A protein has these predicted regions:
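Charged, gly/pro-rich active-site loop segments
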Residues: 1-29, 97-172
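Short, basic/aromatic recognition patches
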Residues: 19-46
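Intrinsic disorder/low-complexity segments enriched in polar/charged and small flexible residues
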Residues: 34-36, 48, 64-67, 129, ...
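A generic alpha-helix structural signal
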Residues: 36-39, 83, 117-122
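Short secondary-structure boundary/capping segments
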Residues: 36-37, 62, 80, 91, ...
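Short beta-strand segments
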Residues: 42-75, 82, 86-93, 100-102
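Alpha-helix N-cap/helix-start capping motif
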Residues: 75-76, 111
Length: 172
């Protein structure tokens, strides 16, 4: 499958409040721009795939957020898992500026997209990858749902609204 470079409705997806068990949720939502800024500047992304027997497999990957899509490369067990079960969760490393994407990973087969990803990888990670000799395939994650929240860890108390700006976005 070839990924689209734009996700319909991705520039301004609908937002709502998620259920946050055991915490107080305030009234303000985060903007989608807040999410895209963090995804764009992240160096490492964590992905969670599912093995054939149903166990989850979590690992860090390097990637690029571009045009509403998370692109990453992997030649590991994650690639095998995605071949059989393309459902994926991806998130950033921070526990205080949380961004979580849920969606489907698609193998990137369009040569022009692969070459663009290699160019962006080389720039971002100071590599010298050759698009004809990649260690593994590239995937594109199309979010179906996203979550985000932020807080200052030093300000969290049992009475605080630690997840006061928790927001959920849904995509068409």
């Amino acid at each position: 499958m070839e990924p689209a470079t734009e996700i319909e409705g991705n520039s301004n997806p609908g937002s709502s409040r998620p259920r946050m068990f055991g915490s107080t949720v305030g009234s303000g939502c985060l903007s989608w721009q807040w999410v895209t800024q963090r995804l764009s500047r992240a160096r490492t992304y964590w992905i969670v795939t599912t093995r054939s027997a149903g166990q989850t497999h979590s690992r860090p990957v390097w990637g690029v957020w571009l045009d509403g899509t998370l692109y990453f490369g992997t030649g590991s067990l994650a690639a095998q898992n995605l071949t059989a079960r393309p459902a994926i969760t991806a998130h950033l490393e921070s526990g205080s500026e949380v961004v979580i994407l849920e969606g489907v990973a698609e193998l990137v087969s369009d040569r022009a997209v692969v070459e663009r990803m290699v160019s962006l990888y080389n720039e971002k990670y100071h590599w010298n990858l050759d698009p004809k000799q990649l260690p593994g395939p590239f995937y594109a994650v199309r979010p179906k749902k996203a979550f985000g929240w932020s807080f200052e860890e030093s300000e969290v108390t049992p009475e605080s609204t630690a997840f006061g700006n928790a927001t959920r976005w849904r995509f068409r």
